[in-house]
């Protein structure tokens, strides 16, 4: 969110989210969320650890505000930065270093990577051992996973449960919590065993937002990363925000090799079309196929590199984005139709590629912002 243009787009999106949060019929803070707040508040004093799951791309905006009500926190707190595979590695390291310098326990994880989850499990087990050395007398250790919607609590709970049970060579039916790309699917608190000798359980909880949201920039980041339902703002606006961030960054320069030689590009295209024509015909509309993703990266690189306008200027940035949408219709195999509907299809596909890490790694806020906001920890 570094440039003035990005902020203008973010402000429009953020204001829409704030307006929705004040709507009496708002969807993300329904009766189930109010009930979850009560249930979680009652259990926090009873658990041994609180694992606050945050989105590594927005370590500030994905803060779990409910924890501010507990000062000091009765349980040992660990900040887990999930979705590390989607964040800028350098910025992520700065964030981890920031927490460590201030003696805050933190850990970065990719909940879909088995080795990464194993390392987190080992870290958690070491914390359990430290707890027992300090005089914890119980035979069971409990860890409550807390966080806003769609930061990956359920995916992480499942991974810890599966790997923990396998590591302990335990038999029996594995449990599963509901995992979805849509925020708000988890409605109840669920207990999953992740270790034995001593027994260790994680409690997966529903994602919780405050009843009202007030900061437009934070709301825009939450919307872009998928913590808030897309239809509140619209995928078209969100995709434009992402393209603004991409166009203002250096991430696209990593794709230069895709365009080093036009002859090479054409040769690869011809070879691909000959050797894999049947494959392409079958999956031509699947934008997640590698050959389509490469084409998307190439088009984005070419359009940004060829642009000679001022990216700090709102009108110029808008013109570049319009050029990119027009070029992307072809590589994303969007049928010829009314421009508005075609752009909606392009936006949906681009947004998905961004959120799955196919279009680079982005951290939307930096350590300087953390330093201003986390004195209460």
Curated annotation (Swiss-Prot):
Keywords in alphabetical order: GTP-binding, Hydrolase, Mitochondrion, Nucleotide-binding, Transit peptide
Any single Gene Ontology cellular-component annotation: mitochondrion
Molecular function in Gene Ontology: GTP binding; hydrolase activity
Motif DARXP motif, chain ranges: 55-59
Annotated ranges, domain CP-type G: 34-211
List of residues binding GTP: 82-85, 110-111, 150-155, 207
Source superkingdom: Eukaryota
Compartment list: Mitochondrion
Location, primary (coarse class): mitochondrion
FT transit peptide: 1-21
Record family assignment: Belongs to the TRAFAC class YlqF/YawG GTPase family. MTG1 subfamily.
Known function: GTPase that may function in mitochondrial ribosome assembly.
UniProt note: domains: In contrast to other GTP-binding proteins, this family is characterized by a circular permutation of the GTPase motifs described by a G4-G1-G3 pattern.
Name this polypeptide is given: DAR GTPase 2, mitochondrial
Provenance organism: Arabidopsis thaliana (Mouse-ear cress)
């Amino acid at each position: 969110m570094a440039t003035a243009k990005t902020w203008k787009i973010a402000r429009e999106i953020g204001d829409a989210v704030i307006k929705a949060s004040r709507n009496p019929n708002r969807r993300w803070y329904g009766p189930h969320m109010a009930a979850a707040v009560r249930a979680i508040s009652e259990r926090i004093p009873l658990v041994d650890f609180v694992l606050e799951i945050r989105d590594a791309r927005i370590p500030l905006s994905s803060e779990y505000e409910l924890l501010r009500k507990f000062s000091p926190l009765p349980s040992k707190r660990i900040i887990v930065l999930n979705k590390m595979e989607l964040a800028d590695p350098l910025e992520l390291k700065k964030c981890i270093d920031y927490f460590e310098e201030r003696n805050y326990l933190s850990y970065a994880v990719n909940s879909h990577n088995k080795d990464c989850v194993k390392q987190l499990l080992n870290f958690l087990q070491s914390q359990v051992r430290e707890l027992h050395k300090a005089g914890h007398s119980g035979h069971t250790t409990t860890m409550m996973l807390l966080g806003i919607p769609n930061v990956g609590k359920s995916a992480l709970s499942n991974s810890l449960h599966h790997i923990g049970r396998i590591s302990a060579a335990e038999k029996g039916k594995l449990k599963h919590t509901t995992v979805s790309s849509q925020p708000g699917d988890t409605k109840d608190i669920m207990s999953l065993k992740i270790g034995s000798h001593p027994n260790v359980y994680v409690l997966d909880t529903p994602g919780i937002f405050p009843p009202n949201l007030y900061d437009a920039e934070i709301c825009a980041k939450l919307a872009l990363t998928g913590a808030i339902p897309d239809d509140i703002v619209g995928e078209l606006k969100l995709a434009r925000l992402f393209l603004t961030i991409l166009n203002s960054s250096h991430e696209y320069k990593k794709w230069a090799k895709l365009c080093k030689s036009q002859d090479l590009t054409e040769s690869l295209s011809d070879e691909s079309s000959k050797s894999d024509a049947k494959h392409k015909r079958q999956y031509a509309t699947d934008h997640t196929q590698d050959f389509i993703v490469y084409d998307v990266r190439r088009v984005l690189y070419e359009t940004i590199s060829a642009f000679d306008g001022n990216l700090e200027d709102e009108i110029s940035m808008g013109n570049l984005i319009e050029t990119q949408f027009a070029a992307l219709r072809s590589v994303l195999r969007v049928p010829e139709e009314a421009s508005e509907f075609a752009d909606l299809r392009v936006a949906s596909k681009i947004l998905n590629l961004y959120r799955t890490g196919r279009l680079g790694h982005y951290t939307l806020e930096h350590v300087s912002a953390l330093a201003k906001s986390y004195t209460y920890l």
